[in-house]
Amino acid sequence: MAVPFRKTSKSAKNKRRSHLALSAASLVSCTNCGAMIKPHHVCKECGFYKNKEVKVVEA
């Protein structure tokens, strides 16, 4: 089984991992109730999408 010839330094390891960071989720406010939702998704609070009720939400 192959093994690394030299130890990977901390800086080389961190440079390799520099692109692995997660980005924050983008959120927008619902046009009907003002709750924060993902773009292009039905609002979980009121069931509206593009100013139309598409899902009945029980109170």
Curated annotation (Swiss-Prot):
UniProt similarity note: Belongs to the bacterial ribosomal protein bL32 family.
Keyword Ribosomal protein: yes
Source organism: Mycoplasma mycoides subsp. mycoides SC (strain CCUG 32753 / NCTC 10114 / PG1)
Keyword vocabulary terms for this entry: Ribonucleoprotein, Ribosomal protein
Gene3D superfamilies xref list: Single helix bin
One term under GO cellular component: large ribosomal subunit
The protein's name: Large ribosomal subunit protein bL32
Top-level taxon of the source organism: Bacteria
UniProt cross-references to InterPro entries, sorted A to Z: Ribosomal_bL32, Ribosomal_bL32_bact, Ribosomal_zn-bd
Signal peptide: none
An example molecular function term from Gene Ontology annotations: structural constituent of ribosome
GO terms under biological process: translation
PANTHER family, per the entry: 50S RIBOSOMAL PROTEIN L32, LARGE RIBOSOMAL SUBUNIT PROTEIN BL32
